[in-house]
Swiss-Prot record:
The gene is murD. Residues 288-307 are annotated as: Disordered. Pfam families: Mur_ligase_C, Mur_ligase_M, MurD-like_N. This is UDP-N-acetylmuramoylalanine--D-glutamate ligase. Pathway: Cell wall biogenesis; peptidoglycan biosynthesis. Transmembrane segments: none annotated. It comes from the Bacteria. GO terms for biological process: cell division; cell wall organization; peptidoglycan biosynthetic process; regulation of cell shape. Belongs to the MurCDEF family. HAMAP family: MurD. It comes from Burkholderia ambifaria (strain ATCC BAA-244 / DSM 16087 / CCUG 44356 / LMG 19182 / AMMD) (Burkholderia cepacia (strain AMMD)). Its EC number is 6.3.2.9. GO terms for cellular component: cytoplasm. It is found in: Cytoplasm.
C-alpha cells in the first residue's frame, strides 16, 4: 500500500486514537516509526509499548527537525490543527521536501486500494456534517445490515478505521460495506478517498478555531466526495448545496437531495403532508415502467419526468424524535439506495432504529412534561435542530463554553418555541445578550441541577424540558456525557419529588 516505498519511515504526529491506529497499521506493514507528541507522556504511549511496537518516541514541541533521518510519510492525527504555528511550519517543511502528509483516512483509502488488487471491492458509504453524523452513520449501518450485508461502522464514531480494517483482515471477515463517520478534521487531509456515496447533512459554525474560517471548514467537509461519488445533499442547507453540480453537468445525475419539503427532482427524498400526516417520500418518474428505466432516464437527462410522490412510510413510525431526525433517516435511506440495496428491508430497519444516547433522547416524562437529553448538542446548529425538530413548547437549558460561536441563529427558534431559557456556564452572558430581543424569560443559574429544577417549575403539561446547551461542556463538566449524567440525576430527583418514576 506504500507504492514503491520499501519499509518507509513514517513520522506519526499525535498519539490519540487515530495516531495509535496509524502506528499500529504502519508497524503491521513493516514501516520504521517515529512518533511525536507535544505531551511528554501521552496516555497511549503505554499501549504502544505494551503492544511491542518498535518506534522512536519524541515528546515536546513539534519542529521540522522531526523530518530528518529519512522520513517519507507524515501521519497526522485529526486533533491537531494545521493552523497551529509549530505544526504549520513542520507541514510546510514536509511539503518542501515532497514528503506525503496523510491522515488516517488517507491511509485507509490507500489500504483499500491495495486490497483491491487482490479482488476486494467493498462499497464505501461516508457521512459528515456539523450535526447528526453519529445518528445517521449508525442508522445507515443498520439499514445495510438488515439488507443482508456484512457491515463495518468506523471512523469518528470509533473504532478507528485502520484498527477495524486490521481486525477484519485478521478474522478473515472483510465487510461488504464500510459505513464511515467522518469529521472535518479527518477530511482535512483526504487526498484519494472516493466513497461510492457520501452525505453532507448540514454545515453550521463549529470548529472555526481549528479551521480558521467557516469557508475553510466547509471546504474540508467537501473533501468527502470523489470524482465518481454519488452526492447525498441536504437541500435545505445553502452551504451544503454549494457542493451540488451545475444542472447538466456530467455528475449531476449522481446527485441526490433530501429535505423537509416535497422533493421536486426525480430520485430525491423529502416529506409530504396529507391530512395531518407527514410521510417520508421519494420523487419518482410516473411514466417509468421500472426503476432501471427511471435511473437510466435520469442519467441520460433527455427525458422530462412527470414527478409523483411515492410514499415510503409515515414519519411518526420512526422511533427517533424530531424533524431533524426525519432528515437523518432520509439521508441514511438515500445512501443505502445509492448502492442499490432493496427498499423493503431498509424501510423495516428505519422503523427499528431507536437512536443514540444524549442526542434528543427523551429520558423521562413526568406529569406530561418530556425531559430531553441533547447534551451532545455542543454547537448552535445542533440546538436549532433540536428546537425546530421537537416542534413543541420548550423550556431550554443552554450554556457552557461557546467556542467563539455566533449565537444569533438561536433567536428565531427560541422566540418561536421557548417558554423560557435557563442559562448556565461561561458563555451564559453572551447567550443572554443575544436572546434578549426575543422577549422570552431568561434566567441564570450557577449549576445545571438548579437550572433543571427551575425548568421543571416553569414547564406546563405538553411541554419539554430540553438540555441542548449549544456549547461545549468542559467549563463545568468532564465531557458531554458527564453533563448528561448530571441532568439525568436532577430529573430523577424531580420524579421522586413528584412521586413518579423515570
Amino acid at each position: 500500500m506504500f507504492g514503491d516505498r520499501q519499509r518507509p519511515m513514517v513520522l506519526v504526529l499525535g498519539l490519540g486514537e487515530s495516531g495509535l491506529a496509524i502506528a499500529r497499521w504502519c508497524a503491521r506493514h513493516g514501516c520504521r516509526l517515529r512518533i511525536a507528541d507535544t505531551r511528554e507522556a501521552p496516555p497511549n504511549l503505554a499501549a504502544l509499548q505494551a503492544e511491542g511496537i518498535d518506534a522512536e518516541f519524541v515528546g515536546g514541541p513539534f519542529t521540522p527537525a522531526l523530518l530528518d533521518g529519512g522520513v517519507e510519510i507524515v501521519g497526522l492525527s485529526p486533533g491537531l490543527s494545521p493552523l497551529e504555528p509549530a505544526l504549520a511550519a513542520l507541514i510546510a517543511a514536509a511539503n518542501e521536501r515532497a514528503i506525503a502528509v496523510w491522515g488516517e483516512l488517507e491511509f485507509f483509502a490507500q489500504a483499500l486500494r491495495a486490497l483491491g488488487t487482490s479482488g476486494y471491492q467493498p462499497k464505501v458509504l461516508a457521512i459528515t456534517g456539523t450535526n447528526g453524523k453519529t445518528t445517521t452513520t449508525n442508522l445507515t449501518g443498520l439499514l445495510c445490515q438488515r439488507s443482508g450485508k456484512k457491515v463495518a461502522v468506523a471512523g469518528n464514531i470509533s473504532p478507528a478505521m485502520l484498527d477495524r480494517l486490521a481486525r477484519a483482515i485478521d478474522e478473515t471477515a472483510l465487510p461488504d460495506v464500510w459505513v464511515l463517520e467522518l469529521s472535518s478534521f479527518q477530511l482535512e487531509t483526504a487526498r484519494t478517498f472516493a466513497p461510492d456515496a457520501a452525505a453532507i447533512l448540514n454545515i453550521t459554525q463549529d470548529h472555526l478555531d481549528w479551521h480558521g474560517s467557516f469557508d475553510a471548514y466547509a471546504a474540508a467537509k467537501g473533501r468527502i466526495f470523489g470524482a465518481t461519488t454519488t452526492r447525498v445533499l441536504n437541500r435545505d442547507d445553502a452551504a451544503v448545496m454549494k457542493f451540488a453540480p451545475a444542472a447538466g453537468a456530467a455528475d449531476a445525475a449522481r446527485t441526490v437531495t433530501f429535505g423537509l419539503n416535497e422533493p421536486a427532482q426525480q430520485g430525491d427524498y423529502g416529506l409530504s403532508r396529507d391530512n395531518g400526516i407527514a410521510w417520508l417520500v421519494e420523487a419518482v418518474d410516473r411514466d417509468a415502467p421500472d426503476e432501471t428505466t427511471s435511473r437510466r432516464r435520469k442519467r441520460d437527462g433527455a427525458h422530462t419526468p412527470d414527478i409523483a410522490q411515492k410514499r415510503l412510510m409515515p414519519a411518526d413510525a420512526l422511533r427517533i424524535r424530531g424533524l431533524h431526525n426525519a432528515a437523518n433517516a432520509l439521508a441514511a435511506f438515500a445512501l443505502a439506495r445509492a448502492i442499490d440495496l432493496p427498499a423493503a428491508p431498509l424501510l423495516h430497519a428505519l422503523r427499528e432504529y431507536r437512536g443514540e444516547a444524549h442526542r434528543v433522547e427523551v429520558i423521562a416524562t413526568i406529569d406530561d412534561v418530556d425531559y430531553v437529553d441533547d447534551s451532545k448538542g455542543t454547537n448552535v446548529g445542533a440546538t436549532v435542530a433540536a428546537l425546530d425538530g421537537l416542534a413543541q413548547k420548550i423550556v431550554l437549558i443552554a450554556g457552557g463554553d461557546g467556542k467563539g460561536q455566533d449565537f444569533a441563529p438561536l433567536v428565531a427558534p427560541v422566540a418561536r418555541w421557548c417558554r423560557a431559557v435557563m442559562l448556565i456556564g461561561r458563555d451564559a452572558p453572551a447567550i443572554r445578550d443575544t436572546l434578549a430581543e426575543t422577549g422570552v424569560p431568561l434566567a441564570d443559574h450557577a449549576t445545571l441541577e438548579a437550572a433543571v429544577h427551575a425548568a421543571a417549575e416553569l414547564a406546563e403539561p405538553g411541554d419539554a424540558v430540553l438540555l441542548s446547551p449549544a456549547c461545549a461542556s468542559l467549563d463545568m463538566f468532564r465531557n458531554y456525557a458527564h453533563r448528561a449524567d448530571v441532568f439525568r440525576a436532577a430529573v430523577d430527583e424531580i420524579a421522586i419529588d413528584k412521586g413518579a418514576t423515570t
